[in-house]
Amino acid sequence: MPGLTSIRTSEGKIEIVNQLLLPHTTEFIEISTIEQAHDAIKSMKIRGAPAIASLAALTIASHLSRALQADPSPDFLTSPLTLQEHVEGHLSYINTARPTAVNLGAATRRLSNILEQSVRAGKDARAIAEDLIREGKEIDEEDVGRNKQMSRHGAEWLLEQWAAKGLSGSNLNVMTVCNTGSLATSGYGTALGLITHLHETGRLQRAFYTQSTPYHQGSRLTAFELQTLNIPSTMLCDSMVGSLFQSHGIHAVAVGADRITRDGDTANKVGTYNAAVLAARHKIPFIVVAPVSTVDLDIADGSSIPIEHRPALEACVVRGALYPVRTDAEGLKEQATVMITPEGLDGVYNPSFDVTPAELITAIVTEKGVAVKRDGESTFDLTSIV
C-alpha cells in the first residue's frame, strides 16, 4: 500500500513508523539493536501480531549482518556454540515483549530451529549466521503474499455465503475491530485485507470499524488506512456495536487474531468478544482472518491463552492533535496527552486482549483456506488450514 507501512528497510537499516503518533504525525524510528526492537514492541510503537514478528526477525538478521561485517569479529562468532548461546539469549529476550501474540513466538522458534539445524549440520559460525539472516528476511517478505491469499479466501467465501441466500449481486457492509491492515502487518493486512479485497473487486458497500479503546487502534490507525485507500467507511464507538447491528444491514464481522487455539478459540483485541456475542445474537457471520503462524496447536482452548494486561495509566489518558488544530514551527500538528479520569483511581481493569469462544465464530481463514465447524459441533477442526 503506497504511503502506509509498519516497517521499511533500506541498505541494512530498519525503520518503523511510530504508531503512537499516528494519524497526525508520521515519524520513522530507526531500530538498530535488539533492545530497541523489544522496547518498540512492548511500548506499542509497533503493534499487530504479524508486524512485531517481522520486526523481531529483521532485527536479529540485521544484528548478525553487522556482526559479519565487523572488524574485529565479535566474540560470539568464535564458534557455532558461542553463536548459538548468543542468539538464543536474544530470541528469548525479544519473545518476552508481548506474551499473547503467538506470531512473535512462532518467528523466534523458527529462527531457533534454523539455528539448531545449522549447528547439527556442522556449519561454522559465519555460515550459521548467514542462514539466520536469510530466514529472518524471509519471515518478513512472505507476509504480504499470504495476507493477499487469506484476504481473497475470506472474501470469496463470504460472497458465496450471501449468494446462497439470494444476494449474489449485493455489495456488503463489513465491520471490523482494532487495526489489521498494512500497519499491523508487512503489507495489505488480514481482516482489513479482506475488506480491501472486497473494495478492490467492487463488492464492498461500506466498512465499519470500532474505535478500539483505550489505544484507539481503530479511530487512529484503521481510519487512517481506510481514508488513504479511499474506502467508504464509518467509525463507531465500541459501545455502539449493538446499535449498529440493530439499525444497519451488516453482512459480516471480520477480525484478526493474536492467537488461535487448537479448537478455534481466538484471542484478539479486547472488545472482539463483545462484538462476537452481539453478532451471534443478530445472526451475522463472524470471521477470523489470520496467518497459519497465529494458530497455536499446542494450546487446546482459550483458557490457557496468556492474556497481557497493560498499565492502568494507558486506560486513563488519550493522545491526539490539539483542537482546533494548530501547527508548530515545522508545520507539524501539535499533539498532547491528556488525562480523562480522576487521578489516583483505586482500580483499573485493562486487559489488552479477550478470548472469543469457537462457538461464536462462523469461519476461520488462513492463507491455506477457510475452516468452518461441522454440523452440530461448537469447535473447529483446523487441520485443513494449517
UniProtKB/Swiss-Prot annotation:
Q: Report the family membership.
A: Belongs to the eIF-2B alpha/beta/delta subunits family. MtnA subfamily.
Q: Which protein is depicted? A: Methylthioribose-1-phosphate isomerase
Could you say which EC number(s) this protein's record lists? 5.3.1.23
According to its UniProt entry, this protein's organism is Postia placenta (strain ATCC 44394 / Madison 698-R) (Brown rot fungus)
Q: Which reaction does it catalyse?
A: 5-(methylsulfanyl)-alpha-D-ribose 1-phosphate = 5-(methylsulfanyl)-D-ribulose 1-phosphate
Q: Which HAMAP family match?
A: Salvage_MtnA
Query: NCBIfam families, alphabetically?
Result: eIF-2B_rel, PRK05720.1, salvage_mtnA
Q: What does the UniProt record say this protein does?
A: Catalyzes the interconversion of methylthioribose-1-phosphate (MTR-1-P) into methylthioribulose-1-phosphate (MTRu-1-P).
